[in-house]
From Swiss-Prot:
The keyword ATP-binding does not apply. It holds the Pfam family Hormone_2. Keywords: Hormone, Secreted. This is Pro-glucagon. The lineage of its organism: Eukaryota, Metazoa, Chordata, Craniata, Vertebrata. It comes from Amia calva. Transmembrane segments: none annotated.
Amino acid sequence: HSQGTFTNDYSKYMDTRRAQDFVQWLMSTXXXXXXXXXXXXXXXYADAPYISDVYSYLQDQVAKKWLKSGQDRRE
């Protein structure tokens, strides 16, 4: 009986320990992800004008291609 009590107590201790380790890991991962997200967000804002210009250019190219394909069909 004492063996079962010890095993049960040890099992509870290990569950608690794993939960604490998981929370610690989660907190450290969240802190690293928040720092990476902040750096990525700053880079995204810096790249926004370039991305916007490229997107506009690509839209223009698609529109020109569409207009040309429409003219080809009419002829």
